[in-house]
Amino acid sequence: IPADNYPCATDYITQMKDMIQILLEKGKAYKHDDGSIYFKISSFQDYGKLSNIKTNNKKPNSRIISDEYDKNNVQDFVLWKAWKVDDGDIYWDSPWGKGRPGWHIECSAMSKATLGSHFDIHCGGVDNIFPHHENEIAQSKCANGKNFVNYWLHSEFLMLNDTKMSKSLGNYYTIQDLKKMNFSSESI
């Protein structure tokens, strides 16, 4: 069944910047000296519910360098990465300076634009539960002021010889490969 929409992240940069601005205005995010914008995890009391993690085991106000960007707290995550010379021409102008959106804000902005600020089912692999889906919940709920998703469905990895099947590892089979190995259509 073909999808109704095939969203491309770069088509939603304006919506991403708008969502970041809302989070800044609500005090859920902050701007670092270099122009990067971070989500303040401590501002969202339900953080960790999906993944069942506790955020109080990290040292508050510790400073680290993550993905080459400073932040005020080890738990905070990037919403907007300030441009650096090494980024070349990969940037967009924003009220905070040149930069690019973080991975998590891309998904929140695209889903809001295509599905609305609240929808029923969100799917992904188990490797997306933390931090990606946890961060999507935090920023979406804080920006929109309501529940983001009713049901989360996460698929497990396909295993092949006790190793995760992965294109990057080259240990995968296509449907055609499985048919040649006499697997039935029902089992595929």
Regions found by a protein language model. Give the residues of each.
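Divalent metal-dependent hydrolysis catalytic cores, especially in the metallo-beta-lactamase
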Residues: 1-9
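Alpha-helical recognition segments enriched in aromatics with Gly/Pro capping
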Residues: 14-188
